[in-house]
Amino acid sequence: MATPYREKIEKMSSEVIDSNPYSRLMALKKMGIVNNYENIRNLSVIIVGLGGIGSVAAEMLTRCGIGKLLLFDYDTVEIANMNRLFFRPEQSGKSKTMAAQETLSSINPDVQFESHNYNITTIDNFEHFKGRIEKGGLVEGEPVDLVLGCVDNFEARTAINQACLELGKSWMESGVSENAISGHIQLIIPGESACFQCVPPLIVASGIDERTLKREGVCAASLPTTMGIVAGMLVQNTLKYLLKFGEVSSLLGYNALLDYFPKDNMKPNPECSNSFCIIHQQKYKEFLKNNPKENLIQNNNNNNINNNEKKSTYENEWGIELIETSEDFNNNNNNNNKPSNNSFEFSYDKKPTVELNEQSTVKVNSSSNLEDLMNQLKNMK
């Protein structure tokens, strides 16, 4: 275990001094963004998978001062992992959980760490994993506050989904595409939003064993930039969810080719194959029936973000004034390269091309449509 570079700090302080690692985090309170940032010390999070997303997410939460992190992985650090963030070459051969805990505890000794070096998909390990969700909180015997899924296969995602459904625990799923140019995060609240099995991926719907698709010498692409962006999206959503500020995204994607961030809300499937999901759906319907004034989580968060924007405009000790919101910016800067809807099926819109001779030219700009192009072609000689 690495020796910490400083003594533990019992209580977060907003005092602006060089030796205070929390002063810039606590400034969020002064800016009117977060009302209770110090509450992060009372929260616990499970991270399953310490790959390109999970390891970076663990570091971010550690630097943010989370109360407790429970780390799950059964893999070892390899030189092939060095194209990503976090792990170092000298840690090669160590279990990812051990290497991660060594690094993270040296970054912030205030955080409690618990590491488990096993595969959660086996029967015995699954029961232990579920037990840590239920009783592995900051105070032993209490549940953790959130589970983050940062795994790269369907089997592990299904195990996390099953454990959280059985316990009624919310979790966030994340992933990056095999070509490394897109990714997503998804908040899964049992009964309120789609669980992982509500809309199964094609590989499962087709009845294919994903293990048969792995070929020797062939691997998925990996970019540290995409991994870092998705990890940032995941932790940002985690902070908003746990500290109750801003708008918590239900489903947020990222397309690196267009720098496009689509959003959507995934409703639960009433014909989901998971019986626990159906039970939670029925409970949530009953809850809404008995509480007609209750809105879905998206509406609640929309109200929160509007209130926070108004508050942060003027109410801070530095007198900083907000002159433009992201909504204003989007309205004033139309980008026709981006689709007008929030479809996650969109990947790349190929620009129209026209073959011309040396004397002929056709001007094509971002606002050109098919009719304009046809008129220009007809006028050519």
Swiss-Prot record:
Q: Provide the GO MF annotations for this entry.
A: ATP binding; metal ion binding; UFM1 activating enzyme activity
Its keywords, alphabetically, are:
ATP-binding, Metal-binding, Nucleotide-binding, Ubl conjugation pathway, Zinc
Positions contributing to Zn(2+) binding: 195, 198, 272, 277
Record-linked InterPro entries: ThiF/MoeB/HesA, ThiF_NAD_FAD-bd, Ubiquitin-activating_enz
**Gene Ontology biological process terms in this record:** protein ufmylation
* Key word Disulfide bond present: no
Output the Pfam families linked to this UniProt entry.
ThiF
Which residues of this protein are catalytic?
219 (glycyl thioester intermediate)
Write out the residues that bind ATP: 52, 73, 96, 119, 153
A GO cellular component annotation in the UniProt record: cytosol
Family, according to the entry, reads as follows: Belongs to the ubiquitin-activating E1 family. UBA5 subfamily.
Tell me the PANTHER family matching this sequence: UBIQUITIN-ACTIVATING ENZYME E1, UBIQUITIN-LIKE MODIFIER-ACTIVATING ENZYME 5
So what does this one do?
A: E1-like enzyme which activates ufm1.
Protein name, please? Ubiquitin-like modifier-activating enzyme 5
Provenance organism: Dictyostelium discoideum
Taxonomic lineage? Eukaryota, Amoebozoa, Evosea, Eumycetozoa, Dictyostelia
